[in-house]
């Protein structure tokens, strides 16, 4: 086992100054890219341009029938009685399309024993895999990695691509190496391992995955480190690697969730972060702690062993702290950038929903516009605010997620830990629409 930690640090362009008065943030001048909100400009992957999800955008968040998920029935089926299942992704090619192996559909999920309380599952997480002939009747195959081989004390979400005859698996090494069950240990690094997939008429299995490497760590400049984050009150992120090849530059990249570099609380909201705010909207001072972004790393060779950190593709400074599980759909020359987030991670003075958010631009690094004007694609209904989460949009327009906590008729709740019904989302230009729902866990 070894660690390749080649990280090239690039500072983003300087942030404009602002003044703070009576707990309300007043922005000063805009950044040099402030005029580029037309959604037509694109840049090279290593450019320092970062698109913005602004407070003005987030103030437009509204729910209606086109973006509200159907209620999850409390009588949902459970795909396995062995483990809780949450963040899930399919086996893909580098072009992001799902793929099969010898007629088998394969998915990967964060799992934990069902003997563990549902709320504690994150601290026991391992990546498990499932396989199916019909893309919905899933058989649990066990852990993806051999015991004791992965970095960290638990495995958090990532992505898995079939490249030639090898399986490249990317994941979040969460916690210190061999750190045990410690919810206070928030260290997160991006990791990778290579294996092979095998199948016969009865089952799917994997070999390899014994040599893991850390491929990226937060640099403190573009991406906040754990130590920097500990000066603030908000949950920290450097996780969720999503691998793909950009069809334009032909390079292999990773998207991931991060926070803007610098000590928590030192960030100063710019006019560009705030956008064209309506009259009377005041920005609470504590908004400066909310600095979510969608990060980018680029492979420096064909082996996918060495990576360079690039500036973030999109920031949500003073808007939201979490831009989890970022992923990409490329369709009709447009790049659809998706992420998931929670109601509780929106900055003070803003409110959203647990659900799926998205943006569209003309290239990988470009002037992303929020879909539907606000970025909301799918949110949980008001009477079931935590019913499902961790949405993943596939190139075919299908959206899978897991069932979280569902209200019951007697006023109680039922924990899910299993896949929800797959939803169908229509994508057209910068608009989306909920178009239907399919079977539970249908991931073709």
Where are these regions (language model features)?
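Secretory targeting and sorting signals
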Residues: 1-32
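Carbohydrate-active catalytic/glycan-binding domains of CAZyme proteins
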Residues: 33-444
């Amino acid at each position: 086992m070894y660690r390749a930690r080649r990280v090239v640090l690039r500072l983003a362009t300087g942030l404009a100054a602002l003044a703070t008065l009576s707990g309300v943030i007043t922005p000063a001048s805009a950044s040099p890219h402030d005029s580029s909100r037309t959604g037509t400009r694109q840049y090279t992957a290593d450019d320092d341009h970062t698109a913005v999800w602004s407070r003005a955008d987030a103030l437009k968040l509204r729910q209606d029938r086109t973006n509200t998920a159907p209620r999850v029935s409390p009588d949902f089926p459970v795909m396995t009685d062995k483990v809780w299942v949450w963040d899930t992704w399919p086996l893909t090619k580098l072009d992001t399309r799902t793929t099969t192996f010898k007629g088998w559909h394969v998915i990967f999920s964060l799992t934990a024993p069902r003997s563990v309380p549902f709320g504690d599952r994150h601290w026991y997480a391992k990546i498990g895999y499932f396989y199916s002939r019909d893309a919905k009747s899933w058989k649990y195959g066990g852990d993806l990695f051999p015991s004791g081989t992965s970095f960290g004390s638990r495995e958090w979400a990532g992505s898995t691509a079939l490249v030639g005859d090898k399986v490249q698996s990317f994941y979040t090494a969460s916690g210190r190496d061999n750190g045990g069950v410690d919810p206070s240990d928030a260290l997160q690094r991006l990791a990778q391992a290579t294996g092979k997939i095998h199948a016969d008429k009865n089952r799917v299995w994997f070999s390899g995955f014994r040599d893991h490497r850390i491929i990226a760590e937060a640099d403190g400049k573009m991406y906040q480190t754990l130590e920097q984050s500990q000066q603030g009150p908000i949950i920290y992120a450097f996780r969720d690697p999503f691998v793909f090849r950009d069809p334009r530059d032909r390079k292999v990249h990773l998207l991931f969730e991060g926070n803007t570099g610098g000590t928590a609380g030192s960030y100063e909201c710019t006019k560009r972060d705030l956008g064209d705010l309506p009259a009377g909207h005041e920005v609470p001072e504590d908004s400066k702690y909310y600095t979510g972004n969608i990060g980018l790393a680029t492979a420096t060779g064909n082996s996918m062993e060495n990576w360079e950190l690039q500036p973030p593709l999109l920031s949500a400074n003073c808007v939201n702290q979490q831009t989890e599980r970022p992923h990409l759909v490329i369709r009709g020359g447009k790049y659809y950038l998706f992420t998931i987030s929670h109601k509780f991670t929106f900055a003070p003075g803003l409110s959203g929903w647990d659900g799926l958010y998205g943006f569209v631009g003309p290239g990988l690094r470009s002037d992303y516009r929020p879909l539907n004007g606000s970025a909301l694609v799918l949110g949980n209904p008001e009477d079931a605010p935590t019913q499902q989460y961790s949405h993943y949009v596939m190139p075919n327009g299908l959206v899978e997620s897991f069932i979280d906590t569902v209200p019951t008729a007697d006023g109680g709740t039922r924990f899910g830990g299993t896949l929800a019904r797959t939803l169908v989302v229509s994508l057209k230009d910068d608009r989306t629409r909920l178009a239907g729902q399919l079977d539970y866990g249908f991931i073709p």
